[in-house]
Amino acid sequence: WHKIEADRPDTVYFVTHSMGALVARSVYHHLPARGWKPFIHRIVMIAPPNKGTPVADFFVQSRLARLLGGPNLPNLTTDPEKGAYSYPIPDAETGLILGVRGGRKGFNLFLEEDNDGLIIPKDAILGNEKDLVFIKATHAGILFKSLTVRMVIKFLRTGRFPWK
């Protein structure tokens, strides 16, 4: 915080992947106390578990999975009290980039709908996003798509994804 406060930037952008979206939402919630909220201009969330994921719901039941997944596994559940739902929704311009397979079933056949292997698109949507785009990619693979990079750059510059 001290370095950022010393630099006092005019504008800050967040680009997150997966749980990084929950970290950004938590940070955004604490910014008013530091007088920074007006400086957060845009947020791009790539494959965010904004409402949690059924995959975490399944694994959080296992003691071994909780041990391997670490203390943050419960934060990724769909539990409205303790899970991803409990993080505040930012009012900054937000764009979502979501991975899908592009069919009725996604990469994880145990999930009911199209998905990136971990996240179902409806569980990523906040409701106040300015724009969203779907890319055929897995949860980790989406980071290595040149299309993802182009989308991030375009949204940070314009607040929209290219083909909107």
Predicted segments, located by residue:
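Serine-dependent carboxylesterase/thioesterase catalytic core
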Residues: W1-D91
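C-terminal catalytic-base region of ester-bond hydrolases, centering on the histidine
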Residues: I89-K164
